[in-house]
Amino acid sequence: MIVGIGTDIVQVSRMTALLGRYGERFPRRILTGDEFKKFSVSKQPAYFLAKRFAAKEAAAKALGTGFGSGLRPCHIGVGHTERGQPFLEWQGRANELVRILGVSRGLLSLADEKEYALAFVTLLAEREGAKPGLSLERALNSLKLSGNGNGVTD
């Protein structure tokens, strides 16, 4: 069953401008530790960031929250299999949300063309009769009740 879908497009020149303005502060804020290591040796850092940022935005949209309720870009990671297939990695608040929503698998597709990077995310659950909208409300309420809904990051 599909729990959520999300898509995002990022202009590479926007990432170039952010890198010029903030230097490493911007990638350190949005990337996971593993992603930052790869970013540090990337030959095309703006393209690297554009793809990662698009993937993180698309995943946040698929979760139904966007970036809010304590969910930050660094809670969503992007990795690749040995054959190059991209996949999502959940950390912190994102990990809590996918667990509460019953997400069993996240599918990620990435594309780029000249000045743009695009990401599409589909979140799947194995359980029958799941109600994603109700689950999202329950997830957000659960985070508030556990003291994690105040925007404090893990």
Curated annotation (Swiss-Prot):
UniProt GO molecular function: holo-[acyl-carrier-protein] synthase activity; magnesium ion binding
EC numbers on record: 2.7.8.7
Catalyzed reactions per annotation: apo-[ACP] + CoA = holo-[ACP] + adenosine 3',5'-bisphosphate + H(+)
Regions crossing the membrane: none
Gene3D superfamilies in the record: 4'-phosphopantetheinyl transferase domain
Pfam families on file: ACPS
Cofactor(s) in the UniProt record: Mg(2+)
Subcellular location(s) of the protein: Cytoplasm
Cellular compartments per GO CC: cytoplasm
Residue ranges the record marks as coiled coil: none
InterPro entries: 4-PPantetheinyl_Trfase_dom (IPR008278), 4-PPantetheinyl_Trfase_dom_sf (IPR037143), ACPS (IPR002582), Ppantetheine-prot_Trfase_dom (IPR004568)
GO BP: fatty acid biosynthetic process
Keyword set, alphabetical order: Cytoplasm, Fatty acid biosynthesis, Fatty acid metabolism, Lipid biosynthesis, Lipid metabolism, Magnesium, Metal-binding, Transferase
Binding annotation for Mg(2+): 8, 57
Major localisation: cytoplasm
Role noted for this protein: Transfers the 4'-phosphopantetheine moiety from coenzyme A to a Ser of acyl-carrier-protein.
HAMAP family in alphabetical order: AcpS
Family to which this protein belongs: Belongs to the P-Pant transferase superfamily. AcpS family.
NCBIfam families, A to Z: acpS, pantethn_trn
Protein name: Holo-[acyl-carrier-protein] synthase
Lineage, top ranks: Bacteria, Pseudomonadati, Pseudomonadota, Gammaproteobacteria, Chromatiales
